Swiss-Prot record:
GO BP term, pick one: negative regulation of DNA-templated transcription initiation
Gene3D superfamilies, per database record: Transcriptional regulator MraZ domain (3.40.1550.20)
GO molecular function: DNA-binding transcription factor activity; transcription cis-regulatory region binding
Keyword match Repeat: yes
Annotated localization: Cytoplasm, Nucleoid
GO annotation, cellular component aspect: cytoplasm; nucleoid
InterPro entries in the cross-refs: MraZ, MraZ_C, MraZ_dom, MraZ_N, MraZ_sf, SpoVT-AbrB_dom, SpoVT-AbrB_sf
Family: Belongs to the MraZ family.
Segments forming domain SpoVT-AbrB: 5-52, 81-124
Protein name, per record: Transcriptional regulator MraZ
Quaternary organization: Forms oligomers.
Function: Negatively regulates its own expression and that of the subsequent genes in the proximal part of the division and cell wall (dcw) gene cluster. Acts by binding directly to DNA. May also regulate the expression of genes outside the dcw cluster.
One Pfam family linked to the record: MraZ
Length: 152
């Protein structure tokens, strides 16, 4: 559904403009409603169409609040989840708390990840790509069974 990397600018109010190519599907699938939250592993944000988020929220509600790790995941994802609505101009307001977490300033990158977007600061995105390409991790040993079967 969502793919590609697009450089965008945040305006003075912390809004970004969703690219035109995604607006119709977001209007159709989730009535322009989205949920933005933090990524658990990297300094970026995750932006979900509302219907996608509802299925994730269901999975999160099935986790046990008695298990410390599961409770931490719930706290981080749900505690930072912010509902955003795309306006008629395609703008989406990112809360100050989320912008601060992802170190967003003027230049941001919107990265399509099939069912969601990642939102990165420009410099953090460039560093992440560099790190991913130059990673010295033994590739074959770290591949999951799903990745071993993926042919590109």
């Amino acid at each position: 559904m969502f793919r590609g990397a697009t450089m965008l600018s945040l305006d003075n109010k912390g809004r970004l403009v969703i690219p035109v190519r995604y607006r119709d599907i977001l209007k159709e699938k989730s009535q322009s409603r989205m949920i933005c939250t933090i990524d658990l592993h990297q300094t970026c944000l995750l932006l979900y169409p509302f219907l996608e988020w509802e299925s994730i929220e269901k999975k999160l509600s099935d986790l046990s609040s008695m298990n410390p790790l599961e409770r931490r995941v719930q706290r981080l994802l749900l505690g930072h989840a912010s509902e955003c609505e795309m306006d008629k101009s395609g703008r989406l307001l990112i809360s100050a708390t989320l912008r601060q977490h992802a170190q967003l300033s003027k230049e941001v990158m919107l990265i399509g990840q099939l069912n969601k977007f990642e939102i990165w600061s420009g410099p953090n995105w460039q560093q992440q790509i560099k790190d991913d390409i130059t990673s010295k991790q033994p590739v074959q040993e770290s591949l999951s069974e799903r990745l071993k079967g993926l042919s590109l």
